[in-house]
Curated annotation (Swiss-Prot):
The keyword Cell cycle does not apply. Pfam families: Ribosomal_L10. SUPFAM superfamilies: Ribosomal protein L10-like. Keywords: Ribonucleoprotein, Ribosomal protein, RNA-binding, rRNA-binding. One of its GO terms (cellular component) is large ribosomal subunit. Forms part of the ribosomal stalk, playing a central role in the interaction of the ribosome with GTP-bound translation factors. It comes from Rhizobium meliloti (strain 1021). GO terms for molecular function: large ribosomal subunit rRNA binding; structural constituent of ribosome. The gene is rplJ. This is Large ribosomal subunit protein uL10. The keyword rRNA processing does not apply. PANTHER family: 39S RIBOSOMAL PROTEIN L10, MITOCHONDRIAL. One of its GO terms (biological process) is translation. Part of the ribosomal stalk of the 50S ribosomal subunit. The N-terminus interacts with L11 and the large rRNA to form the base of the stalk. The C-terminus forms an elongated spine to which L12 dimers bind in a sequential fashion forming a multimeric L10(L12)X complex.
């Protein structure tokens, strides 16, 4: 890479670190190209991205971001997985790490909070932002549904009473 390319790459990576909801750093030594391509496609499908960067350039890109505390993680062959949703990147990385022991999660960051490997693992167990929104909407809609049922119940009961009187009159 030429100097200008490196500057552009660092700037791009810096913007990624600033905009991402979460960042995960992992060792990937021993992961085959096919496995890495599979991992990248899974991450892309979930809405995240996987990048491999020189450690020195990644450390420079971290300067001036909230995630600056994770510079110590960049040793050896490291990859960076990130996503806008704070749960997506950790979830996909941990799922892939379960099936591939060559991928070792080192840690990561969520905003200004630096996470160790256990922190990333626990973050991966949380529901995604969309799932939380769906649960919240369900909780909000549940009382409205109950109110509608209660309001509609007397009308249906009244209709049954009228129907019973009509049948009684017909029988007599």
């Amino acid at each position: 890479m030429e100097r200008a390319e490196k500057r552009e790459f660092v700037t791009e990576l810096n913007e990624v670190f600033k905009a991402s909801g979460s960042v995960v750093v992992a060792h990937y030594a021993g992961v085959t190209v096919a496995q890495m391509n599979d991992f990248r496609s899974k991450m892309r499908a979930a809405g995240g991205t996987v990048r491999v960067a020189k450690n020195r350039l990644a450390k420079i890109a971290l300067q001036g971001t909230e995630s600056e505390g994770m510079t110590d993680l960049f040793k050896g062959q490291t990859l960076i997985a990130f996503s806008e949703d704070p749960v997506t990147a950790p979830k996909v990385v941990m799922d892939f790490a379960k099936t591939n022991d060559k991928l070792v999660v080192l840690g990561g960051a969520m905003g200004a909070t630096t996470l160790n490997a256990e922190g990333v693992k626990s973050l991966a167990t949380l529901p995604s932002l969309d799932e939380l929104r769906a649960k919240l909407l369900g909780l909000i809609n549940a009382p409205a549904t109950r109110v509608a049922t209660v309001v509609a119940a007397p009308a249906s009961q009244l209709a049954r009473v009228f129907s019973a009187y009509a049948k009684k009159d017909e029988a007599a």
